[in-house]
């Protein structure tokens, strides 16, 4: 059997975190077995589906690197196929025309509720042997209903939840085509899964109630049933369902907030799946390890601090030139002055250890790309008359010293020893004069990156 999985979002909004996790698990399972990952856009909800949402979903998948092998397939482009199958089902007797009006169906359900029964279609127009159907109302267009079995159960072994059984008595004769002929959600999904030969359906557990309906339709079509796995929801840190109030829930919010895709993928992989105590792993490792046996049944909790920790790890591991390309546009928005400034990749190498996001990295790197504006009171506090002779000697020696971190460090120590000063006594005024800030990386590294010309110019103004 060739494994074929699918990710089938409805384009009614952004690609959210839960959807991205579903896509990741479906993608990884196909990759693990050398199978095929299909992208299908379920866009039959014409009132809510938008081209912008389709684009947002595709952009989110591309940012994460979850590349599909087939598709994207759009349900709205498959209407002829759905109508063909509906015609076949009507001819086979597995579907029928129903002329009950919406008002009649609602009245029927109200009577059932009043009697303490589960609301369901009562089968008025369902053909049965020896049954006389009502006269067709003049001018009324019918819906098409699926002839659901009235006896027995629907049972499947869910790869996450275990065995699930639903009585057919709990299921309705589902409307599979509206009066205008447009097919409905569960019918389209079943036909698509059959036509696309999907072997494994991995999706959120909000679809559990759809599964028995889709199974019955697939069986009526004589199709091979896929394996189903329903992932538990993702919760916020307060134990409630993840929502906007917990912060970013759209995947494309995360690059805007300075997260790397590899950090997001690593984090999503651990939301409901585990491989021993492994916390950090590449996507190559993940696809080698991933299986459905280690998916958890209980809801996963989204922890922003854990995501930050992973992002810090991947920022530290990332190529500095790549990071420079990502943070430069952010810094331009902050007013960075790149002319006659240090190499950005070199600055990032120095600054990236201390940050959790690219946004933080951009802010930190601005130290090297703006004019210093030290607070006058701080300057008066740290640049005292007792320090000025040492500063003057340091400036003089900077004019000829070899420009390396090691040589600069030796020069600074030599000046400190000559004037019997401790490191902070000279390093603090140097930081203020060169950067305008008291908190910087090692003063030797800062001096080296700024370069001889800039450092001498900024220090010379205060001699």
From Swiss-Prot:
It comes from the Bacteria. It catalyses: tRNA(Glu) + L-glutamate + ATP = L-glutamyl-tRNA(Glu) + AMP + diphosphate. A motif ('HIGH' region) lies at residues 9-19. Residues 115-136 are annotated as: Disordered. It is found in: Cytoplasm. Keywords: Aminoacyl-tRNA synthetase, ATP-binding, Cytoplasm, Ligase, Nucleotide-binding, Protein biosynthesis. This is Glutamate--tRNA ligase. The gene is gltX.
